[in-house]
From Swiss-Prot:
Keywords: Membrane, Transmembrane, Transmembrane helix. Pfam families: Cyclin. This is Protein CNPPD1. It is found in: Membrane. It comes from Homo sapiens.
Amino acid sequence: MDLTGLLLDEEGTFSLAGFQDFTFLPGHQKLSARIRRRLYYGWDWEADCSLEELSSPVADIAVELLQKAAPSPIRRLQKKYVAHVSREACISPCAMMLALVYIERLRHRNPDYLQHVSSSDLFLISMMVASKYLYDEGEEEEVFNDEWGAAGGVAVPTLNALERGFLSAMDWHLYTDPREIFEVLSWLESCVAEQQGRWRGWYTYTDLCVLLEQPTWQLALGSLCQRLVKLSCLLAVAYVSSVALAVASVAVIHQSLGLSCIPTPGPPDLGLTSRCLLEPCIPSVPQCLPSLANVSSCLEGSMGLRSLWGSLLASLTPPPLPPPDPPAPPTLLHNCHLCQKLQRDSPTCHACLHPNRTVPTALSSPWYHTYGLAPPWPWSPVLLSLPQPQQCSLFSVMELARLKSFVFPG
């Protein structure tokens, strides 16, 4: 609360004319409401909640502060003594705050005085000097030294000596700027709010408002908010990065699995080509067909993981065996070493379209192919046209039988 708001009225002017007719200064009611709400004085005017004595939280703060300021073990200040003196001498909150200003001055100007005086005497004499400064002679709130002595249990001569020593230590500088009073009030409010919040275990709305007005709490709250914002940003970046990494990993794995089924292009295997051409006629068909089926299934398996596993299982499954051949008639026929069947025709095997003799490997290579077929490479889009199985000629079988009888007579 600003000091200007206390001295000026609602119109923003303050006139000395008719000053005696004012019961309160402008803004006094706001200050009283602030003290009652934040210093725990209470709102019941008819009960024992007036501003003529210190509240329990303020008394606790006063005891703690005066015990630290005057560490003498003689007549150590207690809360019961503070409550008794404040009730008997009608100590107001403003007198309490002014006394705290005086004690703070003594800590900086004359710390030796605080080492020799007891905390109880310091409380009594500081409250008495502050009350005399605020309430001049002729006011209803003035309290004489004998009344202060009776309230504090101190003789009047002793009390007078304590007063002279206190004024000497203060160097008679009792004037206090109102801004210092409001600074002490703000500090006292924060101490009370923090102490009561810790004692209860939770803070009220008023306590939080008081604490957030302090520069220390504002800096702490600002630093906490900045750290929370930084932590939130880091967590958001980490989350987005993890999601992007997971999506990229799934895409790369899926693409690699799809491409692994398709063989990479390379030079043709001449041995494989010649070996496929020299295989027997009937078994060669089911042995070459699975490789072509694997290529087509792999091409289709790149569209999905399910088809990929199906093609993998199909490639691992062995091809079905061909049906057994019917028993040959007991004739003297030659046995074709390529077709594994009895030949009855010319020496040329029409089933595999190759003569029944040793075929050079170089003729089966794709560079010397004379039939105009596409190269039998796995990556070629044109599939290798396989010859249709046919029965071997009877003349070739008879020729082989004659050759056998000639080589092995009898």
